[in-house]
Swiss-Prot record:
The modification N6-methyllysine is found at residues 5, 19, 24, 37. It comes from Arabidopsis thaliana. Keywords: Acetylation, Chromosome, DNA-binding, Methylation, Nucleosome core, Nucleus, Phosphoprotein. The modification N6,N6-dimethyllysine is found at residues 5, 37. The lineage of its organism: Eukaryota, Viridiplantae, Streptophyta, Embryophyta, Tracheophyta. Transmembrane segments: none annotated. The modification N6,N6,N6-trimethyllysine is found at residues 5, 37. This is Histone H3-like 5. The modification N6-acetyllysine is found at residues 15, 19, 24. It holds the Pfam family Histone. The modification Phosphothreonine is found at residue 12. Its main location: nucleus.
């Protein structure tokens, strides 16, 4: 479709007539058809950025203690049965595991940014581990 020039139009002048509002008593008695208010929705990415700032400020552990403890005991079973753990030992393992994961995700994010993306993918995690010199499982 070809573009055409806009021509000037003559204005009809004046303002459009306003609708008359119903009297206050009549408005209150009328049933509200759209009375259900929609929940507020943030724009995509806003909540994610808020969460990032929140977790970067905080220092508390993010993995739940009992599931982590069960995982540690399950892995330890492969090496020796009937092992017992002090609670401080499990806490130290959890602190170290979270520090490792945070560092890995930082490096992974840098790899994704280098690829001109903001979404991390498994290939970035693999690249970050390879650059760090870590061996993959099964090698």
């Amino acid at each position: 479709m070809a573009r055409t020039k806009q021509t000037a139009r003559i204005s009809t002048g004046g303002k459009a007539p306003r609708k008359q509002l119903a009297p206050k008593a009549a408005r209150q008695s009328a049933p509200a058809t759209g009375g259900v208010k929609k929940p507020h929705r943030f724009r995509p990415g806003t909540v994610a950025l808020r969460d990032i700032r929140k977790y970067q400020k905080s220092t508390e552990i993010l993995i739940r203690k009992l599931p982590f403890q069960r995982l540690v005991r399950e892995i330890a079973q492969d090496f020796k049965t009937d092992l017992r753990f002090q609670s401080s030992a499990v806490a130290a393992l959890q602190e170290a595991a979270e520090a490792y994961l945070v560092g890995l995700f930082e490096d992974t994010n840098l790899c994704a940014i280098h690829a001109k993306r903001v979404t991390i993918m498994p290939k970035e995690i693999q690249l970050a581990r390879r650059i760090r010199g870590e061996r993959a499982r099964g090698e």
